[in-house]
Amino acid sequence: MLSKVLLNIAFKVLLTTAKRAVDPDDDDELLPSPDLPGSDDPIAGDPDVDLNPVTEEMFSSWALFIMLLLLISALWSSYYLTQKRIRAVHETVLSIFYGMVIGLIIRMSPGHYIQDTVTFNSSYFFNVLLPPIILNSGYELNQVNFFNNMLSILIFAIPGTFISAVVIGIILYIWTFLGLESIDISFADAMSVGATLSATDPVTILSIFNAYKVDPKLYTIIFGESLLNDAISIVMFETCQKFHGQPATFSSVFEGAGLFLMTFSVSLLIGVLIGILVALLLKHTHIRRYPQIESCLILLIAYESYFFSNGCHMSGIVSLLFCGITLKHYAYYNMSRRSQITIKYIFQLLARLSENFIFIYLGLELFTEVELVYKPLLIIVAAISICVARWCAVFPLSQFVNWIYRVKTIRSMSGITGENISVPDEIPYNYQMMTFWAGLRGAVGVALALGIQGEYKFTLLATVLVVVVLTVIIFGGTTAGMLEVLNIKTGCISEEDTSDDEFDIEAPRAINLLNGSSIQTDLGPYSDNNSPDISIDQFAVSSNKNLPNNISTTGGNTFGGLNETENTSPNPARSSMDKRNLRDKLGTIFNSDSQWFQNFDEQVLKPVFLDNVSPSLQDSATQSPADFSSQNH
């Protein structure tokens, strides 16, 4: 190698000497070899010179090595935190810090190529990192709690996101209109930033909720809101960007609302139809005999919903979210047992890696993006505006939900009891405060900010980036303390996860087939791992008794019927039990609105989309209860 370099230099010297001999007026100087670092080499920091393929491959390898090292550090930190039972700090916060430290080192180092390679790329984010998170969220969605709290979720997600975007947009527009920092943006751009900063991403908080086993109702409301909120924020942002450079008129509001509703509805329909298509393919073919091919096809077809929707100028996130929900509701029960387990863990694995990569990217972006323009006052105003907007979106809407709940319950109970009843709030104040605290922003906002147009693009991008990092660190880092301060109910779900193979979903159904029992259970697509645990002994006893009175939750509470007359003996805890029973009764009344869809689903849709006897049930019916116990270990 050294001899080649020396020969190359000697050849160039001879060539230059001969050239000067022919043309002595030529003042060209000897140029360094491309293989050797010179003043124009990217190693020395000149960004205008292209690398040769070998050097480019070397720098790309170093960039990937750094990213993988950060990812390994984040996952190892997660293991350490889990082992030491440190639940106040989450790995996502550490991922941001790791990214910030390495980003600062890269920024201070000579050269630019590694810095350019690890810079946040919106195309990578939307096409590679975000889809696994959305798909897993829809697939792992607790459908029972989601549909039971659908009203609260929809109110927070749709009107709440709209209120948040409008409040943030108006505050930023007024601030920039004052001209204190020489920034002048249009109202459409201000609304675009408002939509960007309205995209919540409570990954950190929900992970802490899982560790503390927070009340599933609160978890579902925050989780469901964040799912729909991201999709709605993206649709709102794209709608606002269509009015960039145009004067804001009153008719623009109705035009924007129409575009939003059309985009959301068509995207939802695309996702549901593709999910149903997968269910029908699994039902009418024998692909389940080849689990590896089956798992690959399910994953790829699900991804197709995302890219097809984006290609049609719709929302890929909405399509992928509802495709995941439909896959779990219908296609799951047509899969082979191996594919059920494989798909579950593939989705979880990809989502976990993507989440950590995203937070590492956020930390790196603070220092590796050289074009960012930081305006401290604008950042402070933006941070205050998201708090004001979150307050306007949470507390008034919570009171509205409580009012609807109260009116409906009083009307429903008026025929049962003639006396006035005190209806508990559907969303108590401490739950409202926790929902407010869970409104931290995430990488979706940063990725959307990369699409902002105009002269002040990098100023607004820097503002969004700093606000996102601050909310993750401040709100995410103080969540554990807020759970104690607000006295949020924890420990609602057993620590033991006995559903790794998901045999707990189908084992009771197999017992019914073996014993010829006609007991109807809720262990179907509307149930999940958070459903009441039913043991074999309870199953045998409940055949001669009222089943709801014999099912106990992991927390020790019992579900009683409306005509419950047992246990009339004095009990110190009787009053608290009565309150819980009353709340269960009221909840049953309030959630009865979704019963029509469940009946329609059971009687019409499932016979069309599902096998009469799913393959999983066929496999489990040939085994004894002891076999299920042995396979779970």
UniProtKB/Swiss-Prot annotation:
Present with 521 molecules/cell in log phase SD medium. Changing residue 369 to A: Impairs partially resistance to osmotic stress and hygromycin. It comes from Saccharomyces cerevisiae (strain ATCC 204508 / S288c). Coiled coil: none annotated. Pfam families: Na_H_Exchanger. Keywords: Antiport, Endosome, Glycoprotein, Ion transport, Membrane, Phosphoprotein, Potassium, Potassium transport, Signal, Sodium, Sodium transport, Transmembrane, Transmembrane helix, Transport. Endosomal/prevacuolar electroneutral Na(+)/H(+) exchanger which mediates intracellular sequestration of Na(+) cations, regulates vacuolar pH and contributes to osmotolerance following sudden exposure to hyperosmotic media. Also contributes to the postdiauxic/stationary phase resistance to osmotic stress and allows for the continued growth of cells until the acquired osmotolerance response can occur. Involved in hygromycin resistance probably through its influence on the electrochemical proton gradient affecting secondarily the entrance of hygromycin. Residues 22-61, 107-117, 174-189, 239-258, 309-313, 398-431 are lumenal. This is Endosomal/prevacuolar sodium/hydrogen exchanger. The modification Phosphoserine is found at residues 494, 499, 569.
